[in-house]
Amino acid sequence: MEFKVDTHTHTYASGHAYSTLIENAKSAKENGLTMFCSTDHAESMPGAPHYWFFSNQKILPRFLEGVAIVRGVESNILNIEGEIDIPPSVDRNLDWVIASFHEPVFPPANKEAHTEALINVIKSGRVDALGHLGNPNFDFDFEQVLKCAKEHNVAIEINNTTLKGNSRVGSVDRCHEIAQIGKALDVYFTTGSDAHFCHDVGNLELVSELMDNLDIDSNKVITHSAKQFLSFLELRGRLPIAEYDEIRNA
């Protein structure tokens, strides 16, 4: 499957990534993307920036190197109540919010606690996607969470870095199972490189292989085209981004 959007990328602002936004944009262009989301870690993650960094993305151009730039964040799930570490006042300046578990922020607990946290995150209405769910340290009830995501139009991320097998060890088989259940439940999928260096932006080869093997419908993969991605944002209740009208109407 082909993807024109990468919804999970990091710059050096995340504290443990190594490229600038311009470098990421250049790589995105070289790798054939139409659009990518810049999603640095929110402030609870060690080394991550203050929330002002995310609020101030309003000053960013909508295109760099001819590639559309989506203003986003990878927020941290803080607790079983489903709170994330971005103040609600910042929401209006963001186009795309991922919520993820990270061990330094949410110490792994048990399946029930993780399930409750994910469901509450979804029901909060503040997040557009759940990130790298395959991590075995954060086991959860796949079917229960994915049903909730389907009901609330929250996308399920398939993460290329996870599928390499050397990060979040033990995730690969779980990612396949999550994708199979998601297909059966007709959820929306998104695809993220989780690039922490510019050369990885748009590297979604393993995600493509997984989706082809499972025969996932490209109409349910919001990153298959930039137009599909923008339609999903509107489905989520976000206002159309005027600068992307040409993409939307293509």
UniProtKB/Swiss-Prot annotation:
GO: which molecular function terms? phosphatase activity; zinc ion binding
Q: Which GO terms describe its cellular component?
A: cytosol
Residues the entry annotates as binding Zn(2+) 2: H16, H41, H196
**Cofactors:** Zn(2+)
If you read the UniProt record, what top EC class would you report for this enzyme, in one word? hydrolase
Residues binding Zn(2+) 1, per UniProt: H8, H10, E74, D194
Listed binding positions for Zn(2+) 3 are E74, H102, H132
Q: What InterPro entries does this protein map onto?
A: Phosphatase_YcdX_put, PHP_phosphatase, Pol/His_phosphatase_N, Pol/histidinol_Pase-like
Q: How is the cofactor bound?
A: Binds 3 Zn(2+) ions per subunit.
Family label = Belongs to the PHP family.
Q: What is this protein called?
A: Probable phosphatase VPA1527
Output the lineage of the source organism.
Bacteria, Pseudomonadati, Pseudomonadota, Gammaproteobacteria, Vibrionales
